[in-house]
């Protein structure tokens, strides 16, 4: 089997994003469009045949970086990996962006400023551009955003109530101090000493990827879905 964009396929499958599953089937059959072209076309609501090489590159970063509930930070990481100049990108496409999503992104930026949160070194224009791309991708993927919410809710309730919870094909349950996620294959992902806090959210204990120390690690729906799709 062709394993191109395997994680994107798994996200679509767990989310039951039907239009995307159909697109993967058509592509594999040799009758469908390139998925990065299609990602851009769906987000910007333009004919897929009109997507240029540069626009495909935008679609590729959107597709690879936003599936796990990533936002501006994830897009910045992806852009760096593919040699994108986000300030130039903003200059090139800002005026073409849909005004509704631009206004939403502007309001989000004002909230970020008020909270003194991370802006990733971007100018206002570049931040709004990237956040708008995020919003366009999410609106084109309603089932995917739905599975993020379902996973978050199921994980939280499993910890709080200690009763099994389901999110699509996934089952969350507590076994002692461990949060277990039953995958569609029947295998389990396990998160030791899992707990939920109203302010911190979901956390568990594991080896931190940066410090290599055993410590408390915070997680959320997107990271849980990433673990699931990479298992």
At which residue positions do the language-model features occur?
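Conserved catalytic core of nucleotide polymerization and phosphodiester-bond processing enzymes
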Residues: 1-231
């Amino acid at each position: 089997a062709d394993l191109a964009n395997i994680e994107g396929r798994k996200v679509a499958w767990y989310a039951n994003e039907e239009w995307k599953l159909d697109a993967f089937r058509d592509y594999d059959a040799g009758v469908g469009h390139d998925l990065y072209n299609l990602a851009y076309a769906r987000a910007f609501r333009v004919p897929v045949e009109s997507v240029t090489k540069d626009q495909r590159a935008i679609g590729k970063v959107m597709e690879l970086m936003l599936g796990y509930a990533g936002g501006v930070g994830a897009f910045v990481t992806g852009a760096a990996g593919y040699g994108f100049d986000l300030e130039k990108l903003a200059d090139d496409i800002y005026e073409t962006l849909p005004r509704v999503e631009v206004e939403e992104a502007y309001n989000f930026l004002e909230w970020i400023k008020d909270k003194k949160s991370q802006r990733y070194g971007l100018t206002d224009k570049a931040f709004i551009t990237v956040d708008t791309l995020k919003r366009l991708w999410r609106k084109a993927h309603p089932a995917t955003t739905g599975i993020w919410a379902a996973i978050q809710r199921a994980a939280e309730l499993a910890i709080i109530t200690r009763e099994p919870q389901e999110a699509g094909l996934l089952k969350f349950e507590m076994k002692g101090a461990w949060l277990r996620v039953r995958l569609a294959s029947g295998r389990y992902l396990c998160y030791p000493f899992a707990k939920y806090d109203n302010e911190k959210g979901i956390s568990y204990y594991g080896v931190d990827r940066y410090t290599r120390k055993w410590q408390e690690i915070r997680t959320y729906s997107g990271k849980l879905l990433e673990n699931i799709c990479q298992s």
